[in-house]
């Protein structure tokens, strides 16, 4: 696997501006940013889970992508079909650094950064099939309780290919997800239709873990309109993403997310 770490000069500037601020919101955001990324801490159940999934043979040629944690709203929301007025953009749901930049709320934002990396742009010119995995912290203004945290970890992946090479189907996606359920969790699973702004058709998968059916992940075929928003045409593919804490809790039979 090839690791691609994408840094943002704008993120560095915004972090410096936070350091100069003394208001409550700035202090709170700084504290969240300083929290460890458990998906990269050896020995953490979160890291163990992300490593086990990444190690599946079907992901052998996928890139591992690390992206900024402070992202512009037009990238996080507009490009993903969440326009002005969408509930996800509410300041009651999302941590705003300023009017145009927020703490990332969902993992698929890595698509944009990945597609704009110089190496990947060159591979697109060569009409290569591309696969990538991204995991790390995300931030939402959820009320903290036994099953929710406002800072948690997501794992996402996608596979895209030129239209003239292959047309990826829902069955291809479900085969990939079945691989995770059976080989990582040794679990029974089932799919049902859902809706997401950036995939169509979309599916959620439930898995039976330790005798309980739990919502495991969201997935779907990548919307062509979203790819066009990011400047890419002539490609198609699948994507999925899920919260690592939810699955770690289920597999370890933990009663409270705060025990992780």
Q: Residue spans of the language-model regions?
A:
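TRNA-recognition modules of translation machinery and tRNA-sensing kinases, especially anticodon-binding
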Residues: 2-260
């Amino acid at each position: 696997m090839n690791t691609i770490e994408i840094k943002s000069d704008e993120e560095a500037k915004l972090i410096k501006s936070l350091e100069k601020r003394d208001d409550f919101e700035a202090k709170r955001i700084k504290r969240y940013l300083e929290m460890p990324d458990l998906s990269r801490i050896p020995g953490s159940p979160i890291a163990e889970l992300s490593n086990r999934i990444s190690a599946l043979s079907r992901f052998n040629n996928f890139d591992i992508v690390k992206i900024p944690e402070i992202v512009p709203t037009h990238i996080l929301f507009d490009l993903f079909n969440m326009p002005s007025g969408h509930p996800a953009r509410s300041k009651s749901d999302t941590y705003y650094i300023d009017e145009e930049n927020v703490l990332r709320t969902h993992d698929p934002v890595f698509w944009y950064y990945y597609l704009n990396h110089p190496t990947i742009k060159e591979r697109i010119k060569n009409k290569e099939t591309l696969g990538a995995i991204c995991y790390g912290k995300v931030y939402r203004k959820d009320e903290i309780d036994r099953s929710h945290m406002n800072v948690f970890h997501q794992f996402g992946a996608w596979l895209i290919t030129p239209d003239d090479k292959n047309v990826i189907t829902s069955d291809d996606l479900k085969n990939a997800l079945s691989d995770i359920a059976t080989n990582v969790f040794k679990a029974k699973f089932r799919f049902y239709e859902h809706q997401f702004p950036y995939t169509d058709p979309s599916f959620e998968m439930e898995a039976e873990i330790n005798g309980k059916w739990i919502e495991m992940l969201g997935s779907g075929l990548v919307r062509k309109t979203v790819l066009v928003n990011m400047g890419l045409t002539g490609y198609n593919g699948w994507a999925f993403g899920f919260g690592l804490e939810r699955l770690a809790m289920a597999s370890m039979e933990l009663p409270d997310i705060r025990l992780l």
